[in-house]
Amino acid sequence: MENGATQSTQRARGMTKVIVDGKEIDVPPEYTLLQACEAAGAEIPRFCFHERLSIAGNCRMCLIEVVGIPKPQASCAMGVKDLPPNKDGSPKILNTKSAMVKKAREGVMEFLLINHPLDCPICDQGGECDLQDQAMAYGVDDGRYRENKRAVEDKYIGPLVKTIMTRCIHCTRCIRFTTEVAGVPELGAIGRGEDMEITTYLEHAMTSELQSNVVDLCPVGALTSKPYAFAARPWELNKTQSVDVMDAVGSAIRIDTRGREVMRILPRVNEDVNEEWISDKTRHVVDGLRTQRLDQPYVRVAGRLQPVPWKEAFATIASKVRASSGKRIGALAGQLAGVEEMFALKSLMAKLGSKNIDARYPGSPLHTKFGRASYLFNSAIAGIDDADAIMLIGSNPRREAAVLNARIRKRYLKGNVLIGVVGEKADLSYPYNYLGAGPETLAQFVEHAPAQKEKPMFIIGQGALNRPDGAAVLAMAAKAAASLGVVKDGWNGFNILHSEAALPGALDIGFVPEEGGMDTAAMLKAGELDVLFLLGVDEVEVPAGGFVVYIGTHGDRGAHRADVILPGAAYPEKSVTYVNTEGRAQMASRAAFPPGDAREDWAILRALSEPLGQRLPHDSLGALRQALYAAHPHLSRIGQVTPGDASDISKLAKLGGHHDKAPLRSCVSDFYFTNAITRASAIMAECSALAHAAARTAAE
């Protein structure tokens, strides 16, 4: 009676009972046998199977025994629901450790190694190679093959991915990734059997901004990182968890260092943000951390920057600040600034009696006073998976947030979603309905909108906001959101897509001018300020005349204009908090040390406050964070999204103003050159040149 009740409960839940290596478990019928075995704790080797790619069933390494079926089965390609039922109705028995399975795996491994070269000592995959690990665990100690091995010519597929195709085992992970995830089907297979080759057909550089993820996916050494070739072995490296700042997505990354040098950057899994992908810019900007670095303080003397001790640099700044008043002192924060240093700079400016602080692009309508929901990606990035209609307004997510764009493509492949674009036409890697170029298109769309969807979403890029009529465009989008059900009970699809890592955090702590303070545009007018502090600001033109203090990492535009340079720490060189575009506070840990006399930005500001006569109270990073969390408690919830109040969006509708007919354009014109670190990178320069050449060729 009890057994019958249990079976009835399982059927009601839609679960299927199987026995794996003697262990009885219930699994959903849509599981593959591989997933069922892993749910039971069994380890199943694989090369071609990947959780985020379609099933290929190429490698046959995942063979298991299904009792009742005479031959071993590929567990990745067979579903639980496909199992033939036992005549007596008993659960199917799956064996992963039987003699049949052991012999089958040894045979598969022997075939895989027939043509695989003995390159392990010179292979960059050595030490983190799936083939090495599985050959040790499931192979035999001697092969019977004595004929000549095949050799395959290496292919050129760009400056980022190195190919040694003789090592390829034809798992096709790279093909499936570029086709399905990246949406740029540039890799494919030609030939069959032993003559099969992975190629770009016509030899050329790949164009996807996510192409280097194939290096992580490749289970052997066929595809490796070209810039990292022969640089280090994995066991030599210290590994530090951190956060990417090349865009505002806040992808989870791992920074590998050797000594004081950053050697490489790899992705970490974060299902809610980047899944397990990162952009090529995130991964390969490493060489930009080594070049054009500021490693000591400088003061401009007779028109030339001269290296000086810290004490002299501080004294020079103090003399200028004392000669001015709070109303004629201002501070701007750049796109890579962390929350802690912006909080310290805001505190210092308050002590100096200045309300002139800003981190926004000149003329941006975003402001703390409208509430958090007015400037965040409110549905969260994972909310894209649930949307049934997506409108991109003044945004090209492929250039502004490549990983987020892959998420939109993933939603498109799932089906039953409408995607519309207001702004520039571009290849986004998925089809969309082009509605028009200018803001007036949005008004027309509201008037002739189709039937409301269940979970519609607006994604508003900075290209729609960083323009003279940005406030009017934002107000129009807020009104459209209200009329189309973008914001309603249980769903907030009104999303601002930031392109700068610092801006959401700056808005969270109020690093914007208060009543009576000057914004970015006002501070950049000639003659308005006597002293201007630039915290890593390199994207704006600072007029001549005022005294400029630059705290930053590279000899870029801001440093060239500066009268005093204080060398700071780049993002891998400091422990700092960033808030991503969805409002998720994330901690970046220090992986390396800044070069020379450079120091962490908050420490520079703390030291500077003393000669200015306005001593900041925090003597340690812990004390600074304690003050930060007291003022903004939500920032202490690391890794969590603190949602904004959806009613705040209605405030935006009251902004008003007139919009012009100028087309909306993406705020990012060159994916590979977006900040000082990327502009210092030779690899990014090469990628940029190739991208421009490809664009010219496509236009011809």
Regions found by a protein language model. Name each.
Residues 36, 44-45:
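Protein-protein interaction/assembly regions in multi-subunit complexes
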